[in-house]
Amino acid sequence: MKKYKFIWTVKSECGPVRKKNEDSIFPLESGSSKTSIKAGVFDGMGGHKKGEVASDLASKTMHRDFDSITDYVKTANRDILEYQSSNDDAKGMGTTMTVVKISQDGTLSLAHVGDSRCYVLSSRNMIQLTEDENVPGYQNVLTQALGSKEKLTIQNKDFQLSSGDVVFLCTDEIGRAHV
């Protein structure tokens, strides 16, 4: 079995439209590992109350250990809904969530809700693993997000990486503008 070494770089900053950054990322710092890795990007819903709180709550689930990548999404959604129910000023808050777990053998497992994106860049091409969940004709309106409803339809995908492949997670602003 081929073993991989994982190297990651993270960057999050407020774009030109918003006054505050409502995105969260996991892990918080760049690094490397010879074992498996999990990573995620979370885009708090701009224009809604407490989008930054929703994305932060979702990113904090990544500190836990679950067998299934979808359990991170389900738990984050439950945490956000519970926060909303005990904080009147948080009603309507939400976030996207795109998370991956990459095992030692290079198997990438993906769970996704919203319009953040996951790409794999190989020596031959770029593959978008996620599908945007936007209302047709309204690229800024999501059909679902964490915190919007109890039962979410979670996109799942497994993908076998090859040596040298790059996994790129980004929010919709980067995905639409630069990729």
Describe every region a protein language model picked out:
Residues 1-176:
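PP2C/PPM-type serine/threonine phosphatase catalytic domain
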